[in-house]
Amino acid sequence: MEKLKQNPIVKKLGLNRILLVCNLVLMFVDFKVVLGSKFPVGDSIKSTLNYVYFLGFLSLGVTFVIATGGIDFSIGPVMFCCALISGYCMTSYHVPCAAAMVICVLIGFAFGMFNGWMVSYMSVPPFIISMASMNIAKGIASVFTKTQSVSWPLGSDPVNGWFRNLVSYKGFPVGLVIFLAVAVVCGIILYNTKPGRYILCLGSNSEAVRLSGVNTKKWRMLAYVICGILVGIGAIFFVGAYTTVQPGYGDQYNNEAIAGCVMGGTSMVGGLASIGGTVIGVFIISLLQQGIMAFGLGKGQQMIITGLIVIVAVYVDVSARRRKN
């Protein structure tokens, strides 16, 4: 094992990431062997990618928040709120699709600003404010849409159907390219810029950063703003893949996004984050969901399995930190 760790390729890519990719491949093979025709390769890959498109943006966003030592349980309902309100504006007020997409991102930005302000400047615990935002997002979406589901245009729509090309164009996974490009940008921000380094330092030792003269409130708030923007983008890709959105939903994606993030190597106590690991973790969670559905398990069983994954990932993280210390 020590020789493997010293391998230049392994050191460059990271042993944990390589193991995650191996787990992803083995999981896919296992599902195919066990399920057979119930798990068709082409359809399974397409369904997994549709899940990755939106869940990936949620996981990337919450990676920034967790890196500061915070948490955000509102990302799923906020994503639905973004999609519902912007879609309602398009269907009821004939707002152009491009403008509706901008509204999506702006709503996510507003929630990110609100959460960041309350955590950073009002000293409200992240858990409390994120739970409050979750209910606020559900309430606003229900009131605005009169508790009605909202459907975005189909690809056949001659005026607004073009936005679906962001997900897939003639079978080519455009959404995957966009997601990976955004992940690269997130990695550059987190590892190669001053704001990113401050965000990571906040999770490691917030008090030491404050005593060194850094405005910790500003940088903590920035992490939540980035998260909100990415959630807004995720809403666009959700409706691009699934069309219809219903008020009152979205909670189930909180744990899945956090599970992908933590499974990828981001520490729940902050200070350590892996964008590359998050990307792989999202693929694993998305593939797992497709496998669970192919087995015929219900939503309740899916939530139980996702919750157990979070527990195991956090336990592994805590154990690793104890060994280091």
Per-range role (PLM):
Residues M1-V29, S204, L211-K218, I292-N325:
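Cytosolic-side transmembrane-helix boundaries in multi-pass membrane proteins
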Residues H94-M134, I280-G281:
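Alpha-helical transmembrane segments within multi-pass membrane transporters and channels
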Residues V231, A241-G307:
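Transmembrane alpha-helical segments in multi-pass inner-membrane proteins
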Residues P126-N192, W219-L222, A241-G250, Q301:
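Transmembrane helix-bundle core of multi-pass membrane transporters
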